[in-house]
């Protein structure tokens, strides 16, 4: 065959292969180092070698990327810049933003959370996996925005990230004019019933000292004209910690399908006053969610905020299932089932299974009612199945603000108990051992070894006056998985403190002291019980919840 025809055939075959997808560009890995990088290099190597080597700035790294590409930030380095990568990945080949090297997480520190500064910004993009990055003093750590009419994006994975120190709080009714410090915000300009972003995972992340942790939002922040409009889908949280924040750490609006599993929300609202209430979490206009093995505790109304509940279904939430969750130590109710505050649609299909509510309702402000549950209308459809209610003196089970003939609350195989009667049976015999401080803690660990498998539903703690424990975690040993599992996150102990937990079966328990206000740590009692659950509580649909205040 003549050379001309051989060349022509090769070119034709190459073109055909491109058209058929036979060739794909090889994924590239880019390196960025504030300490050793140079923007004149190609970014394709971790160490400098001729023209190869890491970039220096996130501005330089804000280029077009292809599916499967990686952007790696050097551990131990710090940037006061925004990373705005271009392009999208796919669920199968996401664009990875992560780290390389040794040391602490790479840090994006914007230095002033009162300025509208972001750590990573996405614009109508999907297919990103963000792993192992720290965000500090950003008004928003990760901000992703989606335009009206934009095509649906898929896949956003955020794992092992640390969001901290953004306590700006202003009246944010006109958001996205940003006036509030957030860890992550997904914002949709779409007003139609259309999904703009789906398949989102937030895993093993810490949100600390933020006005609010994670938001989904739209231009009408309170969504009064957006009934049953869902712009986000399949949003999942797993093994995350939210603590020392101001307002609701999960502010979730307009999301169909999602989950919260093995998450802890702790110490919310102190030293702060909100214009529209405080809660551990607030969900509005959401559907088809599952919450499992999670905890919301120590929610404070601070300097005069309203509400103060552990959890708030704000309205228009349908088919929401909560299993094995603990709601405790709140200034307001343990649980708020709200309506009217937003669009007026009641919550439907709320199911609570094997949950513990030990609210205490220490200082309710708005409304001035002490109850484990505040339900704004009998039209709320909620089923409480095998739940346990601990009532402090004068605290009721449920208060309904607007009474209706159609009462849709049901209590089945539940129990109600005075908190003062807790830990009244014989404690489990156990050997308590004090051990040195564990990683990440400033105090010792106290271990209870029962020598056999026991069932536990309550702990009693006592502390010497010379001690000042201010943060601790109680964990039980999972024999099947051979690992420790959190069952209660606490603050002060004082003379005596009762920790009611979701029932556990275990052979060991431990208390890890995380923080102490004083030099000494002296725990005089760490006792475990399988106490009687209290009085049966059964209310059929249409019935009235008994007036049974705690004693």
Residue ranges: model-predicted function:
Residues 10-22:
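Bacterial N-terminal signal peptides
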Residues 34-80, 84:
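Acidic Gly/Asp/Thr-rich repetitive segments characteristic of extracellular carbohydrate-active
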Residues 52, 69, 176-187, 380-395, ...:
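Acidic, glycine- and Ser/Thr-rich low-complexity intrinsically disordered tracts
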């Amino acid at each position: 065959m003549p050379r001309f025809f051989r060349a022509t055939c090769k070119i034709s075959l190459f073109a055909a292969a491109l058209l058929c997808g036979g060739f794909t560009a090889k994924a590239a890995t880019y390196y960025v180092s504030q300490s050793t990088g140079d923007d004149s290099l190609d970014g394709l190597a971790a160490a400098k070698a001729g023209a190869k080597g890491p970039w220096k700035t996130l501005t330089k790294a804000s280029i077009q990327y292809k599916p499967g590409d990686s952007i790696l930030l050097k551990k131990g380095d710090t940037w006061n810049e925004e990373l705005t990568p271009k392009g999208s990945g796919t669920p199968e080949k996401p664009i990875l933003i992560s780290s390389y090297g040794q040391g602490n997480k790479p840090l994006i520190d914007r230095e002033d959370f009162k300025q509208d500064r972001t750590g990573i910004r996405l614009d109508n993009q999907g297919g990103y996996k963000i792993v192992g990055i720290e965000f500090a003093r950003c008004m928003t750590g990760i901000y992703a925005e989606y335009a009206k009419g934009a095509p649906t994006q898929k896949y956003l994975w955020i794992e092992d990230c640390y969001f901290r120190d953004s306590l700006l709080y202003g009246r944010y009714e006109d958001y996205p004019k940003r006036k509030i410090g957030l860890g992550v915000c997904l914002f949709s300009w779409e007003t139609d019933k259309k999904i703009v972003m789906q398949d989102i995972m937030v895993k093993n992340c810490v949100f600390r000292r933020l006005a609010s942790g994670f938001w989904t939002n739209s231009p009408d922040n309170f969504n009064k004209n957006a009934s049953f409009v869902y712009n986000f889908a399949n949003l999942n949280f797993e093994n995350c910690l939210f603590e020392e924040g101001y307002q609701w750490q999960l502010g979730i609006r307009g999301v169909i399908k999602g989950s919260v599993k093995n998450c802890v929300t702790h110490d919310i609202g102190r030293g702060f006053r909100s214009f529209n209430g405080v809660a551990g979490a607030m969900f509005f206009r959401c559907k088809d969610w599952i919450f499992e093995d999670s905890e919301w505790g120590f929610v404070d109304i601070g300097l005069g905020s309203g509400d103060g509940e552990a959890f708030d279904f704000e309205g228009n939430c349908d088919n929401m299932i909560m299993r094995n969750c603990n709601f405790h130590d709140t200034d307001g109710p343990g649980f708020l089932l709200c309506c009217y505050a937003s669009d007026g649609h009641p919550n439907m299909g709320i199911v609570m299974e094997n949950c513990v509510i030990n609210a205490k309702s220490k200082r309710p402000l708005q409304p001035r009612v002490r109850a484990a549950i505040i339900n704004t209308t009998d039209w709320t459809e909620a089923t409480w199945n095998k739940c346990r209610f601990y009532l402090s003196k004068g605290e009721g089970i449920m208060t309904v603000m607007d009474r209706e003939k159609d009462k849709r609350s049901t209590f089945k195989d539940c129990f109600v108990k005075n908190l003062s009667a807790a830990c009244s049976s014989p404690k489990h015999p156990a050997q308590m051992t004090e051990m040195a401080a564990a990683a990440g803690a400033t105090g010792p660990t106290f271990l209870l070894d029962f020598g056999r498998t026991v069932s536990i539903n309550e702990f009693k703690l006592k502390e010497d006056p010379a001690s000042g424990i201010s943060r601790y975690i109680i964990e039980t040993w999972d024999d099947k998985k051979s690992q420790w599992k959190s069952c209660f996150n606490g603050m002060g102990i004082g003379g005596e403190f009762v920790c009611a937990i979701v029932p556990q079966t275990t052979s060991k328990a431990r208390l890890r002291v995380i923080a102490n206000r004083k030099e000494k740590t002296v725990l005089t009692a760490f006792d475990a019980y399988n106490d009687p659950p209290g009085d049966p509580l059964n209310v059929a649909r249409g019935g009235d919840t008994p007036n049974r205040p705690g004693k």
